[in-house]
From Swiss-Prot:
Protein name per Swiss-Prot or TrEMBL: Thiamine-phosphate synthase
Any one GO BP annotation for this protein: thiamine biosynthetic process
Co-factor: note: Binds 1 Mg(2+) ion per subunit.
Residues annotated to bind 2-[(2R,5Z)-2-carboxy-4-methylthiazol-5(2H)-ylidene]ethyl phosphate: T134, Q135, T136, G166, V186, S187
Known function: Condenses 4-methyl-5-(beta-hydroxyethyl)thiazole monophosphate (THZ-P) and 2-methyl-4-amino-5-hydroxymethyl pyrimidine pyrophosphate (HMP-PP) to form thiamine monophosphate (TMP).
Cofactor: Mg(2+)
Similarity annotation: Belongs to the thiamine-phosphate synthase family.
Enzyme class: transferase
Pathway: Cofactor biosynthesis; thiamine diphosphate biosynthesis; thiamine phosphate from 4-amino-2-methyl-5-diphosphomethylpyrimidine and 4-methyl-5-(2-phosphoethyl)-thiazole: step 1/1
Catalysed reactions, as listed in the record: 2-[(2R,5Z)-2-carboxy-4-methylthiazol-5(2H)-ylidene]ethyl phosphate + 4-amino-2-methyl-5-(diphosphooxymethyl)pyrimidine + 2 H(+) = thiamine phosphate + CO2 + diphosphate; 2-(2-carboxy-4-methylthiazol-5-yl)ethyl phosphate + 4-amino-2-methyl-5-(diphosphooxymethyl)pyrimidine + 2 H(+) = thiamine phosphate + CO2 + diphosphate; 4-methyl-5-(2-phosphooxyethyl)-thiazole + 4-amino-2-methyl-5-(diphosphooxymethyl)pyrimidine + H(+) = thiamine phosphate + diphosphate
Keyword Metal-binding: yes
GO CC annotation: cytoplasm
Length: 211
């Protein structure tokens, strides 16, 4: 049963781009995206604070669900919609502080054991990956594939879920057919020949999410 310790999110978050700049946040919100994540890696808080502030302001302007990856202190300070954490971040993050601030929490998982760990934290949603081979980041685990993804979805039942990893425009319908609530994409948009067209097509497939 879906009873998170954090504020709830819709079962369907819709198309969920993960991008590394405020410029991409603005472009995609203007294009109609309503769930998005700012993921800037390996910088100090003070180096990214201005970007976090700008991204959160854009999220508010477009009434969007904007998640900040990793920089949870800044997300709390500037009142983001939510925070997304990797497994390695769970042990070093003050989850109670995120909870007390009223922010949503998403957690990455790669196998059943990590799903168990995520469920223990009772987050707002659980991300499942990587589904297909991906060039976006180095992954220590093997791709799960659609059958394993479907198995995870069946196990998680009514828990909001996000599939991530190597999801292209062509693969998105099959991913959604597993019952997953939403699809996260990176290069399918940022490396597309025409990002506007790619975004429009992905929105037509995955939607903007439930209210």
């Amino acid at each position: 049963m879906y009873q998170p310790d954090f504020p709830t999110v819709p079962f369907r978050l819709g198309l969920y781009p993960v991008v590394d700049s405020v410029a991409w946040i603005e472009r995609l919100l203007e294009a109609g995206v309503r769930t998005i994540q700012l993921r800037i890696k390996d910088k100090r808080d003070e180096e990214v604070e201005s970007d976090v502030i700008a991204a959160i302001a854009l999220g508010r302007r477009y009434d969007a669900r904007l998640f900040i990856n990793d920089y949870w202190r800044l997300a709390i300070k500037h009142r983001a919609y939510g925070v997304h954490l990797g497994q390695e971040d769970l042990e070093t993050t003050d989850l109670k502080a995120i909870q007390a601030a009223g922010l949503r929490l998403g957690v990455s998982t790669h196998d059943d054991m990590e799903i168990d760990i995520a469920l223990a934290a009772k987050p707002s949603y659980i991300a499942l990956g990587h589904v297909f081979p991906t060039q976006t980041k180095q992954m220590p685990s093997a791709p799960q594939g659609l059958a394993q993804l479907a198995s995870h979805i069946e196990r998680l039942a009514d828990y909001p879920t996000v599939a991530i990893g190597g999801i292209s425009l062509e693969r998105a319908p099959a991913v959604l057919a597993t019952g997953v609530g939403s699809v996260a994409v990176v290069s399918a948009i940022t490396q597309a020949a025409d990002w506007r067209e790619a975004t429009a097509q992905l929105l037509a497939i995955a939607g903007v999410g439930d209210e």
